[in-house]
């Protein structure tokens, strides 16, 4: 065996003995580095005659290729072994039982929404739906709010660039009453409907949010009175709070879409809120102008309407003091209701 063949055999042995990439690089330097044995052999060619240099160069190149092939093979083997070890370390025992999936829950405001629909549905009220982007006429004008009404200002209402197909300004609805207008213009009396949904106003503090939920109710017929309104709402709050031990009072107030108008307060007969009058709703007899805008003759039909904030009802039902808790997504808070 000539010296170059012995060199190849020795290189293959050294590469095979390398147990990691660092050891392999050290072995490579011994043969193929700047001062490696193959490199020194290549440098010695300059001392040979041209014909001998050509022949010896071919032999050295052949030896170099064999050494490089052995190096590549060992490098691949080490890489594969490292990958296999990592996969074995990360292996999953497929015989282990699976992890149970966490179940979600209904948001407390949505629970109140569902509860309101159940209560009013049980006494014959339909549920209306409608767009959250409304036009100026349906949100304000149809409800007897003139163009100079302060609620139309940019400080209270989120306006949207552009107009609808009829050239009316667009905005995010400030209450769910527009759904009642749309429902009434598409149906004939008797009308009994509630309109729950999201609403938007420029407001944000511990008791107000720029986005909040309302439920409004409307009853239009020929022979109803304010006494019917009182009876319906009294039965509703007793069912919602699941107690007969409460009082309800109506205070005179003003709303452009009802006349007469009232604020509705309740007082619990027991619990931490015992004896305190708490505002829960605005209500009243539908204004004649609003009835006309709905397409009804106020001389023939009469109606009453009411509206409550779902967050407000939920806060009273569960004893929550800060409205912002509903929107922070804190699971420690939300899990208490599921």
Curated annotation (Swiss-Prot):
It is found in: Cytoplasm. The keyword Aminoacyl-tRNA synthetase applies. InterPro entries: aa-tRNA-synth_II, aa-tRNA-synth_II/BPL/LPL, Phe-tRNA-synth_IIc_asu, Phe-tRNA_ligase_II_N, Phe_tRNA_ligase_alpha1_bac, Phenylalanyl-tRNA_Synthase, tRNA-bd_arm. Mg(2+) binds at residue 259. Gene3D superfamilies: Bira Bifunctional Protein, Domain 2. Its EC number is 6.1.1.20. GO terms for cellular component: cytoplasm. Belongs to the class-II aminoacyl-tRNA synthetase family. Phe-tRNA synthetase alpha subunit type 1 subfamily. This is Phenylalanine--tRNA ligase alpha subunit. It comes from Janthinobacterium sp. (strain Marseille) (Minibacterium massiliensis).
């Amino acid at each position: 065996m000539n010296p170059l063949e012995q060199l190849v055999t020795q290189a293959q042995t050294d590469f095979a003995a390398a147990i990691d990439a660092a050891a392999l690089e050290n072995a490579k330097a011994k043969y193929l580095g700047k001062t490696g044995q193959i490199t020194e052999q290549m440098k010695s060619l300059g001392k040979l005659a041209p014909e001998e240099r050509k022949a010896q160069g071919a032999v050295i190149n052949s030896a170099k290729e064999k050494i490089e092939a052995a190096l590549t093979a060992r490098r691949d083997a080490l890489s594969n072994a490292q990958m296999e070890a990592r996969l074995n370390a990360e292996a999953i025992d497929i015989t282990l039982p699976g992890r149970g999936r966490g179940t979600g829950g209904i948001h407390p405001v949505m629970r109140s929404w569902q509860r309101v629909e159940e209560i009013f549905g049980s006494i014959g009220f339909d549920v209306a739906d409608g767009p959250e982007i409304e036009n100026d006429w349906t949100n304000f004008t149809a409800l007897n709010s003139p163009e100079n009404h302060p609620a139309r200002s940019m400080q209270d209402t989120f306006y949207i660039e552009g107009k609808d197909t009829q050239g009316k300004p667009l905005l995010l609805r400030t209450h769910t009453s527009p759904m009642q207008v749309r429902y009434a213009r598409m149906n004939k009396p008797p009308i009994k409907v509630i309109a729950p949904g999201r609403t938007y106003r420029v407001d944000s503090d511990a008791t107000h949010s720029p986005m909040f939920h309302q439920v409004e109710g409307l009853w239009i017929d020929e022979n109803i009175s304010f006494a019917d309104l009182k009876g319906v709402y009294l039965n509703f709050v007793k069912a919602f709070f699941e107690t007969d031990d409460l009082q309800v009072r109506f205070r005179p107030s003003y709303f452009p879409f009802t006349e007469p108008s009232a604020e509705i307060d309740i007082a619990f007969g027991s619990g931490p809120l015992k004896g305190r009058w708490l505002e829960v709703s605005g209500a009243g007899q539908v204004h004649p102008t609003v009835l006309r805008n709905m397409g009804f003759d106020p001389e023939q039909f009469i109606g009453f309407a009411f509206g409550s904030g779902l967050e407000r009802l939920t806060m009273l039902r569960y004893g929550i003091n800060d409205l912002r808790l509903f929107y922070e997504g804190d699971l420690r808070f939300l899990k208490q209701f599921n």
